[in-house]
UniProtKB/Swiss-Prot annotation:
InterPro entries: Putative_zinc-finger_domain (IPR019607), Red1 (IPR039278). It comes from Schizosaccharomyces pombe (strain 972 / ATCC 24843) (Fission yeast). This is NURS complex subunit red1. A zinc finger (C3H1-type) spans 618-639. The lineage of its organism: Eukaryota, Fungi, Dikarya, Ascomycota, Taphrinomycotina. Keywords: Coiled coil, Metal-binding, Nucleus, Zinc, Zinc-finger. It is found in: Nucleus. The keyword Signal does not apply.
Length: 712
């Protein structure tokens, strides 16, 4: 919790210190230079704060309310040592003592020094020759000393030739460094150390919570406070949080770059240049407006779209001498010309223009129909052939395989589309003389495609389809079938060669296997396939029948196989292999009689080592053929699962058979006898074989087959 400061007590102490300094200054003025007054107190250098004195002028102390020992929280508290005084650099206003009420003593001017005391040092050190000088020299020196005194009074920081004045000023600054008169208001004083003290004091007060308005309320000049705030980079706004230091470097930079612009000049303007010199701009001249260009008649008489009379010109190409209508002259329609604007001088209404456009549209439609009629008479359409003539001969479904079916289906779809297409004749018979459009016919095989005019709204669309002769259709069908047959025959030949090569490879493999089995004395001829299975008789028969009647072969295959698959898909033969017991995966497989025959390393095999941890993976580096040298590898390694001969024998003898304790004891006793009969020089394999034989013998003697009670 922050400590509250009593401002009244601070004001009282500040007034006492001020009065004491005034007394010291008056004593110094009465003393001669170089003398020490008896009334001067001995200054204690250890304590910079002057001793407290009881005020002798009670009228200077304002009457304040009684002191409260437990005052409330002050919004503007000042945690500094008493008496606190801002440096004199801030005091440009009438109140020279900040944070204190203004009294009569604050405006009191100090008494001037005596002329004798000011010049006592100079008079004492004068030469004897100067004492006998005339009165004119004395009066002149008196005037010079008077001017020097006035200069020292107005500017205390200026250089003075009087050394006594310098000593007195130095003594006063040592006694009270915080107090000074308003004579320090000169601009040169801002370069002294007091300005740094002022900046330091303002920053400390700002950290405590004193803001711009608080300084103004105490009577400090606003411009001085504003300058200090800008120099320190503090925010001069009234509303700010406690203890926050808002830097306003941008404002300071902008204020430093401000330039004066003289706006009183009439024809000159100061522009922001490099040297800041004003630039005189030339006076503006009155521009003479140029006359507008005279528009042409055709520009002034232009009208919006649709307002002018439409003119349509249709030309006919009559260079065909073979036409029946080549010599006939087409009479142009005699349409009445609408009255133009230039003739009558009247503007036509919108309805008149629309009626005129409709008439022109009807005329264009009639002329287009006439053109179509002429074109149809020149190269008329033939009647479409019937769909019966377009039918293809029936192709047996079983004659081809699935791949051929897809090709045939695609071909039939194309033929159906061509046979079922609607051939549209040219529009209705249009003739001004009543002649029919289907009168003339030609033998031309191609027709010209007529483009549809966008203004034909009521005419039927004309579709032109290229026709083919039935003989051409049959010829194309035969060509397609021939291509399909050739393709399928090529694939069949490819499959036949592939089957032959695979058959030869299998024959060689089975022959090699038979030789190896005969070398081991365990030939198994029954596992080899028959020679009839490896012959190509069946394949050749199938190919011959496919050439003669492929439909019967495909029907027989598809009828016996499910889901449309052939029997060849289920005839893949798997070569026979020897029987392998599932018990070989157990560790007790070592007691099997075939263990030694089937396992190459026999009892030393790592596969059946009991040191293998089933819940621990093997090192990936060793499983790929490398050697793991990592001591911190947590995976299993092959070097860890190796077992010595003694460990293997102990592991084999650890298997105790028996369902109860009696059987287990009998098995142990028999195993001990077997181990005692072995010598130290006995081979490891022989010892392990004896243990396995004893285990199997004991199991065979006690193997019982439960037989149910059967009554005969």
């Amino acid at each position: 919790m922050s400590r509250s400061i009593n401002l009244d007590e601070l004001r009282k102490k500040a007034l006492e210190s001020k009065k004491k300094n005034e007394e010291d200054e008056s004593n110094d003025s009465d003393k001669e230079d170089g003398e020490i007054s008896e009334d001067d107190p001995v200054i204690d250098q250890s304590n910079s704060v002057p001793p407290m004195k009881v005020p002798t002028f009670p009228e200077q102390i304002p009457q304040l309310p009684p002191f409260d020992r437990f005052p409330g929280t002050n919004a503007n508290f000042f945690p500094f040592g008493a008496p606190f005084m801002l440096p004199p650099a801030l005091m440009f206003g009438p109140n020279t003592v900040p944070f204190f009420p203004q009294t009569a003593s604050s405006n009191k001017t100090f008494s001037k020094r005596k002329r004798s005391s000011e010049n006592s040092f100079n008079n004492r050190n004068k030469a004897k020759s100067s004492e006998t000088s005339d009165s004119s020299n004395t009066s002149q020196s008196f005037k010079e000393n008077r001017a020097l005194k006035d200069t020292a009074t107005s500017r205390p920081l200026a250089l003075s030739s009087d050394t006594s004045y310098q000593k007195s000023e130095k003594a006063k600054s040592e006694k009270s460094p915080f107090l000074s008169t308003s004579k320090n208001s000169d601009a040169n004083y801002s370069k002294t150390t007091n300005q740094k003290e002022a900046e330091k004091a303002v920053s400390q007060l700002f950290e405590v919570g004193v803001r711009f308005n608080d300084f103004i309320a105490e009577g400090i000049e606003p411009s001085v406070v504003h300058t200090l705030f800008l120099k320190l980079g503090l925010d001069s706004s009234s509303a700010s949080s406690q203890g926050s230091l808002t830097l306003s470097a941008d404002k300071a930079a902008r204020s430093a770059k401000l330039r004066k612009i003289d706006s009183n000049l009439s024809d000159t303007h100061i522009l922001p240049g490099d040297n800041g010199t004003p630039t005189v701009l030339p006076e503006r001249k009155n521009l003479i407006s140029l006359p507008l260009l005279k528009q042409d008649d055709w520009l002034s008489s232009s009208k919006p779209f649709g307002s002018s009379t439409p003119n349509v010109v249709i030309e006919f190409d009559s260079d065909d001498d073979g036409d029946d209508f080549s010599n006939s002259k087409i009479e142009q329609s005699n349409l009445e010309k609408p009255p133009s604007n230039s003739e009558n001088g009247l503007t036509m209404s919108r309805s008149d223009y629309l009626a005129l456009l409709r008439n022109k549209e009807e005329e264009i439609r009639r002329m287009t129909k006439l053109i179509l009629r002429l074109e149809s008479n020149k190269k008329p359409y033939r009647s479409p052939t019937s769909a019966a003539d377009m039918k293809l001969p029936s192709v047996p479904v079983a004659a081809v395989d699935n791949k051929s079916k897809t090709h045939l289906d695609t071909f039939e779809k194309v033929v159906d589309l061509s046979s079922k297409a609607d051939f549209v004749e040219a529009g209705p018979s249009i003739s001004s003389s009543g002649a029919s459009s289907s009168a003339a016919t030609t033998n031309s095989d191609t027709t010209e495609q007529i483009l549809e005019a966008p203004w034909l709204r009521k005419t039927e669309q004309i579709a032109v389809v290229h026709e083919e002769h039935p003989a051409q259709i049959k010829k194309s069908e035969i060509d397609i079938l021939n291509n399909l047959i050739e393709k399928e025959e090529g694939e069949l030949t490819k499959y036949q060669t592939l089957v032959k090569s695979k058959t030869e490879i299998l024959t060689q493999l089975y022959t090699r296997k038979k030789q190896l089995l005969e070398q081991q004395g365990k030939g198994n001829v029954a596992c080899l396939p028959k020679e009839s299975d490896l012959s190509m008789d069946s394949i050749t028969e199938v190919s011959a029948q496919a050439d003669e009647n492929s439909s019967q072969i495909l029907s027989s295959k598809t009828s016996n196989a499910p889901n449309g698959t052939t029997e060849t898909d289920f005839e893949d033969k798997v070569p026979l292999v020897d029987y392998i017991s599932p018990f070989y995966r157990f560790k007790s497989y070592r007691f099997n009689q075939q263990f030694v025959e089937r396992v190459p390393l026999k009892y030393r095999s790592l596969t059946y080592s009991n040191k293998i941890e089933p819940m621990k993976v093997f090192c990936k580096y060793e499983t790929t053929g490398g050697v793991c040298n990592d001591d911190h590898c947590e995976a299993s390694h092959f070097r860890d699962i190796k077992m010595t001969d003694d460990e293997i024998i102990q592991d084999l003898s650890r298997y105790i058979e028996g369902n109860d304790e009696i059987e287990k004891e009998s098995y142990k006793s028999g195993l001990d006898i077997v181990m005692k009969n072995t010598d130290e020089n006995t081979d490891f394999v022989d010892v392990a074989t004896r243990i396995v034989e004893y285990h199997n013998l004991w199991k065979s003697e006690r193997m019982t087959i439960p037989v149910a009670k059967v009554s005969i």
